[in-house]
């Protein structure tokens, strides 16, 4: 798994167990963000839910998702969160000097999740990290102490999570062709379902509080009204590229969306300034596949199998960012955790769905029974008086 994200001029890349960073204005080689040896065992929050008592042992740590905080805190802190195949969520903070150089980075907290994480995002205030997992559950973790609560559950694997800019809606995309908008933090209230995709929904991009873009396996780009939740307002068919859509990223400053596809090197940039969506295709020089894409200021940052490119939205020119040999090897050799998200339609999917649903409800009932037992076992009545 390999990812790229950005905050202002700073870009972060995660691949395998590596985390690298660079500033766009410097155009220098990437630097190591933090060493895993800095993980403080005392800051690993023990899980409150019923999973393995010990942390999952893996042959090699692999990062499965990556996110950067939304705003600067009052002390100028920036936060980065990653989820790994150890079923852990690690939160780091870093500080910069007046020149924008990172002067220190340290481990804040680690939380343990029930299942392997698939998507991660900070809430509006950066007080919590929200994580979706393979089992269809969404948990929220405090960045201060790692405490966790379950926010939502589904039958299908969560593939992406996002927030509306006002922080009042949590948006979830899943493998069962749908997107949900949940009220936040009262996520027991589902405001709306967005139905129209015919294959899995892999990726979301939020334009404003009432404009959501989604895409995935059906090769279509959909635009939805979050408030009205009706049919898509705009649709763009990208099936001519003959590949599922891997990721979309929106640049609000230039009002453009970038689209990358599975296993091809083309980036499609969609101009949102006109009602009729206009597209421009950009082939990434010297690359065979685009793994991830992020937006920052005047650029789309594209992560490939062996390269990092910046697409300047003022002139559509590309800038090449040098990367080190270790990262190149990792980008080349690291594969997706799940290679194929399409459903197997060669057998009775209904039977499989009913089994997953029954298992999910059984887990919920177990949690309720355990909670009732805890309450009944702590009724405030101690042992009777002693006769001695």
From Swiss-Prot:
<keyword id="KW-0677">Repeat</keyword>
<feature type="repeat" description="WD 2">
    <location>
        <begin position="112"/>
        <end position="151"/>
    </location>
</feature>
<dbReference type="GO" id="GO:0005634">
    <property type="term" value="C:nucleus"/>
</dbReference>
<dbReference type="InterPro" id="IPR028884">
    <property type="entry name" value="Trm82"/>
</dbReference>
<feature type="region of interest" description="Disordered">
    <location>
        <begin position="365"/>
        <end position="388"/>
    </location>
</feature>
<comment type="subunit">
    <text>Forms a heterodimer with the catalytic subunit.</text>
</comment>
<dbReference type="GO" id="GO:0106004">
    <property type="term" value="P:tRNA (guanine-N7)-methylation"/>
</dbReference>
<feature type="repeat" description="WD 4">
    <location>
        <begin position="196"/>
        <end position="234"/>
    </location>
</feature>
<protein>
    <recommendedName>
        <fullName>tRNA (guanine-N(7)-)-methyltransferase non-catalytic subunit</fullName>
    </recommendedName>
</protein>
<comment type="function">
    <text>Required for the formation of N(7)-methylguanine at position 46 (m7G46) in tRNA. In the complex, it is required to stabilize and induce conformational changes of the catalytic subunit.</text>
</comment>
<dbReference type="InterPro" id="IPR015943">
    <property type="entry name" value="WD40/YVTN_repeat-like_dom_sf"/>
</dbReference>
<dbReference type="InterPro" id="IPR001680">
    <property type="entry name" value="WD40_rpt"/>
</dbReference>
<keyword id="KW-0819">tRNA processing</keyword>
<dbReference type="Pfam" id="PF00400">
    <property type="entry name" value="WD40"/>
</dbReference>
<feature type="repeat" description="WD 3">
    <location>
        <begin position="153"/>
        <end position="194"/>
    </location>
</feature>
<comment type="similarity">
    <text>Belongs to the WD repeat TRM82 family.</text>
</comment>
<keyword id="KW-0539">Nucleus</keyword>
<comment type="pathway">
    <text>tRNA modification; N(7)-methylguanine-tRNA biosynthesis.</text>
</comment>
<dbReference type="GO" id="GO:0006400">
    <property type="term" value="P:tRNA modification"/>
</dbReference>
<dbReference type="GO" id="GO:0005829">
    <property type="term" value="C:cytosol"/>
</dbReference>
<keyword id="KW-0853">WD repeat</keyword>
<feature type="repeat" description="WD 1">
    <location>
        <begin position="58"/>
        <end position="102"/>
    </location>
</feature>
<dbReference type="GO" id="GO:0043527">
    <property type="term" value="C:tRNA methyltransferase complex"/>
</dbReference>
């Amino acid at each position: 798994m390999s990812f790229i994200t950005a905050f202002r001029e700073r870009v972060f890349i995660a691949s395998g167990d590596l985390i690298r960073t660079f500033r766009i204005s410097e155009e220098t080689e990437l630097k190591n963000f933090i060493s895993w040896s800095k993980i403080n065992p005392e800051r690993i929050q023990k899980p409150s839910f019923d999973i393995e008592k010990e942390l999952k042992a893996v042959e090699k740590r692999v990062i499965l998702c990556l996110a950067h905080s939304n705003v600067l805190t009052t002390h100028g802190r920036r936060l980065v969160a990653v989820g790994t195949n150890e079923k852990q969520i690690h939160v780091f903070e870093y500080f910069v000097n007046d020149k924008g150089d990172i002067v220190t980075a340290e481990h804040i907290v680690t939380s343990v999740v029930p299942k392997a994480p698939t998507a991660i995002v900070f809430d509006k205030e950066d007080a919590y990290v929200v994580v979706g997992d393979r089992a269809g559950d969404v948990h929220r973790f405090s960045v201060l102490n790692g405490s966790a609560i379950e926010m939502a559950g589904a039958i299908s694997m969560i593939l992406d999570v996002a927030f509306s800019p006002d922080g009042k809606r949590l948006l979830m995309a899943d493998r069962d062709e749908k997107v949900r908008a949940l009220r936040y933090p009262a996520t027991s209230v589902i405001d709306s379902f967005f139905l129209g995709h015919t294959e899995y929904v892999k990726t979301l991009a939020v334009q404003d509080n009432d404009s959501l873009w989604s895409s995935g396996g059906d090769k279509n780009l959909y635009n939805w009204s979050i408030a009205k939740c009706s049919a898509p307002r705009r649709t763009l068919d990208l099936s001519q590229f003959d590949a599922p859509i891997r990721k979309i990223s929106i640049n609000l400053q230039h009002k453009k969306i970038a689209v990358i596809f599975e296993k091809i090197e083309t980036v499609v940039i969609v101009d949102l300034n006109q009602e009729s969506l206009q597209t421009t295709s950009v082939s990434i020089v010297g690359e065979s596949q685009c793994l991830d894409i992020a937006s920052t200021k005047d650029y789309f940052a594209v992560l490939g199998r062996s390269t990092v490119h910046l697409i300047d939205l003022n002139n559509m020119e590309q800038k090449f960012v040098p990367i080190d040999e270790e990262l190149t090897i990792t980008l080349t050799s690291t594969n997706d955790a799940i290679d194929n998200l399409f459903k197997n339609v060669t057998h009775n999917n209904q039977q499989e769905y009913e089994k997953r649903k029954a298992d999910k409800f059984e887990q919920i009932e177990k949690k309720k029974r355990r909670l009732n037992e805890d309450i009944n076992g702590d009724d405030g009545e101690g042992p009777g008086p002693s006769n001695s």
